[in-house]
From Swiss-Prot:
Main localization category: cytoplasm
Biological role stated in the UniProt entry: Transfers and isomerizes the ribose moiety from AdoMet to the 7-aminomethyl group of 7-deazaguanine (preQ1-tRNA) to give epoxyqueuosine (oQ-tRNA).
Designated name of the protein: S-adenosylmethionine:tRNA ribosyltransferase-isomerase
EC number(s) stated in the UniProt entry for this protein: 2.4.99.17
Top-rank lineage group of the source organism: Bacteria
């Protein structure tokens, strides 16, 4: 398949720069992958799409304030985006500077954080933080929320709360699992009251999620690696749900990728069950032709043209159905990307 198959033109004014005042105040487009039918509603009404006994699977990663601005000791400006914390005092990071820093280069970030570049790991730089406090403590104190490049504004205090799900638990992401941003405590309680079961996986979203696909033949694209964990209690909940003839509904593409990574690993080992616990990096790339083993429906935001996430939802609901739904969303002026509106998609 060609990259251009997943292209569409999005008017600039439809890119949401800020979230809605209330988390549940977004619009919700319902797409039935079986027939391509589209329905327009509000996220606050999402309960009508779920039934008692269904399982909703959320990603409980916590976004770390991973962006640090500063300068080299010699004076040149630098911008650091932590990709992964590797120990209490080290991290892998993207570093933007007029000249790539060499090993031994010292950086002064946010006027208080002293860092030494110790080497490279592919496109990433290995950083040593020269402090007694942990990297995470330093980031929580001095870092900026790593807003995506298309939210073209400086981060604000409100982003510390709003670019984070209400159920976040495990620090490690440098981008939010954005479908989850629409859920607040009252809607989570309403789901439980309705008899819907909730489960939590972890996938630490990396900055690679914003990297463009650079090949024309999408099968040649190499996915970035992200850490994912699907614990035993989630496996049990999935198997239980399937046994009862109910649906597994993923909240976000990261939950889809976590569950299907666990299922893929299970199949490769020749397990009898469709899914088993998973606790490692995943490079799963889901595009049309992929056979879903676990996920029956999903909540997701609107994605960038030609992105791997467009390919994932096209695999899930049919490319033509997705492209038609997107054209309708654009015509009706839905808000796009991380702080934008949501979709509820049922599998083709």
């Amino acid at each position: 398949m060609k990259l251009s198959d997943f292209s569409f033109v999005l008017p600039e004014n439809l890119i949401a720069k800020y979230p809605t005042q209330q988390r549940t105040a977004s619009r919700l487009l319902h797409l039935d992958g079986k027939n391509g039918k589209v329905e327009h509603t509000m996220f606050a009404d999402m309960l009508k799409f779920v039934e008692p006994g269904d399982l909703l699977v959320f990603n409980n990663t916590r976004v770390i304030p991973a962006r640090l601005l500063g300068k080299k000791e010699t004076g040149g400006q630098v911008e650091v985006l932590i990709e992964r914390i590797t120990s209490d005092t080290t991290a892998l990071a993207h570093v933007r500077a007029s000249k790539a820093p060499k090993p031994g280069t010292k950086l002064i970030l946010e006027e208080k954080v002293n860092v030494t570049v110790t080497g490279r790991d592919d496109a990433l730089f290995i950083l040593q933080f020269d402090h007694d406090e942990t990297v995470l403590t330093l980031l929580e104190a001095h870092g900026h929320m790593p807003l995506p490049p298309y939210i073209d504004r400086p981060d604000e205090n409100s982003d510390k709360e709003r670019y984070q799900t209400v159920y976040n638990e495990k620090p490690g992401a440098v981008a939010a699992p954005t479908a989850g941003l629409h859920f607040d405590d009252s809607i989570l309680n309403a789901l439980k009251e309705k008899g819907v079961n909730l489960a939590f996986v972890t996938l630490h979203v990396g900055a690679g999620t914003f990297q463009p696909v650079r090949v024309d033949n999408i099968q040649e694209h190499k996915m970035h690696a992200e850490f994912a964990e699907v614990p035993q209690d989630v496996v049990d909940a999935v198997l239980n749900t399937k046994a009862n003839g109910k649906r597994v509904i993923a909240v976000g593409t990261t939950s889809v990728r976590s569950l299907e990574s666990a299922a893929k690993a299970s199949a490769e080992r020749g397990d009898e069950q469709i899914i088993a616990p998973f606790n490692e990096d995943t490079e799963i790339f889901i595009y049309p032709g992929f056979e879903f083993k676990v996920v029956d429906a999903m909540f997701t935001n609107f994605h960038l043209p030609e992105s791997t996430l467009m390919m994932l939802i096209s695999a899930f609901a049919g490319k033509e159905n997705v492209m038609n739904a997107y054209q309708e969303a654009i015509a009706k002026e839905y808000r796009f990307f991380s702080y934008g509106d949501a979709m509820f998609i049922e599998r083709a």
